[in-house]
């Protein structure tokens, strides 16, 4: 989702800065970037992935007062925007607001496309079908088979090959400073 925020830049509304876990986050560089952009535009829009880590390899969100682990024993991600907002306010004295999209993105059915709705419905239908055939520990996957016309197929993949794995964003997609997507 954080990388996808870059798409709005093509219409002139995208974030000024984008931070993702694949690049080490440097607080001093971040504050410098925010200060520079704010001095030019009087506003700064930042998109941040919850999993960003500092130079010591620690999740930035660990600076929160409350932390817990997920079912795999990993730190439950969330709230990094608030941490950064507090730092910007404290260090730069700028007015800040943090918006966390985690719940909004899951509950905004009013902005779903017809394709989103159709594919979600068909994935659920396919999942029930394979379950009734006796399959368990599988995940329904959607693969595009054609762009024109647009077509997809539904298959199953062992859950063990998906859960608890990360597919990183290629370094070639991240600018040298690590504060945006190319």
Question: Predicted regions span which residues?
Answer:
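C-terminal non-catalytic interaction/assembly regions of soluble proteins
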Residues: 62-182
